[in-house]
Amino acid sequence: MKVQPSVKRICDKCQVVRRKGRVLVICSNPRHKQRQG
């Protein structure tokens, strides 16, 4: 899980999701997991 000031989609399977006020990127590739913070 990368914590970054701005999250971006890296590949086509990345999805930007809002959960509990946080912006997350979930993907089938675990290296692409990101959280805004």
Swiss-Prot record:
MF term (GO), any: structural constituent of ribosome
One Pfam match: Ribosomal_L36
The keyword ATP-binding belongs to this UniProt entry's keyword annotation: no
Signal peptide from the UniProt entry: none
InterPro entries: Ribosomal_bL36, Ribosomal_bL36_sp
Keyword Metal-binding: no
CC per GO annotation: cytoplasm; ribonucleoprotein complex; ribosome
GO terms, biological process: translation
Keywords in alphabetical order: Ribonucleoprotein, Ribosomal protein
Similarity field: Belongs to the bacterial ribosomal protein bL36 family.
Protein name: Large ribosomal subunit protein bL36
Gene assigned in the entry: rpmJ
